[in-house]
UniProtKB/Swiss-Prot annotation:
It comes from the Viruses. Upon interferon induction, ISGylated via host HERC5; this results in the impairment of NS1 interaction with RNA targets due to its inability to form homodimers and to interact with host EIF2AK2/PKR. GO terms for molecular function: protein serine/threonine kinase inhibitor activity; RNA binding. This is Non-structural protein 1. InterPro entries: NS1 (IPR004208), NS1A (IPR000256), NS1A_effect_dom-like_sf (IPR038064), uS15_NS1_RNA-bd_sf (IPR009068). A motif (Nuclear localization signal) lies at residues 34-38. It is found in: Host nucleus; Host cytoplasm.
Amino acid sequence: MDSHTVSSFQVDCFLWHVRKQVADQDLGDAPFLDRLRRDQKSLKGRGSTLGLNIETATCVGKQIVERILKEESDEAFKMTMASALASRYLTDMTIEEMSRDWFMLMPKQKVAGPLCVRMDQAIMDKNIILKANFSVIFDRLENLTLLRAFTEEGAIVGEISPLPSLPGHTNEDVKNAIGVLIGGLEWNDNTVRVSETLQRFAWRSSNETGGPPFTPTQKRKMAGTIRSEV
């Protein structure tokens, strides 16, 4: 098991514990509490996958964070926070690509948490790229404005957008929705790749084909999810 995967999980568990204390003191707003609940489910799933106890991981995560804070000078901390807290807005799409109307021959829509996934299931044997406009904080995707799937010819064949009725979404929500979209498109023998910007800030890694690091099992599961909804 990758040690970075384990330490990341441990730190995430401790940070969730800190956020839970904030919520218990009635200091969190609705989106904060919504993300807290969603992240709790995500941590349980990751813990089960990794075979790690959440309580133990939280304790180790606390030690990691305390060590980092102890080693970091006040000046370095101020400089890090000044740069990290500056939210950036990144754009794969032009204004025209974002605002363009598009139509589906075989429309399919699925709600994936607080996000809506739409795609044209009539599209087959195409090379498709996913582009997105989103904000970034702490070098991680913070808020998705809009994601669209484009063919090489520039046609829009899929889309992911936030649901107005469910404000607030996490990085994991976005990745799950992208997985649903990719699974549905690949079911029809399309080849899907993700823009470099989206790979960098959603996954912080990618595979050699330009796609997110989904396993074959995950891809089959995602494709099956879309197929069962048809």
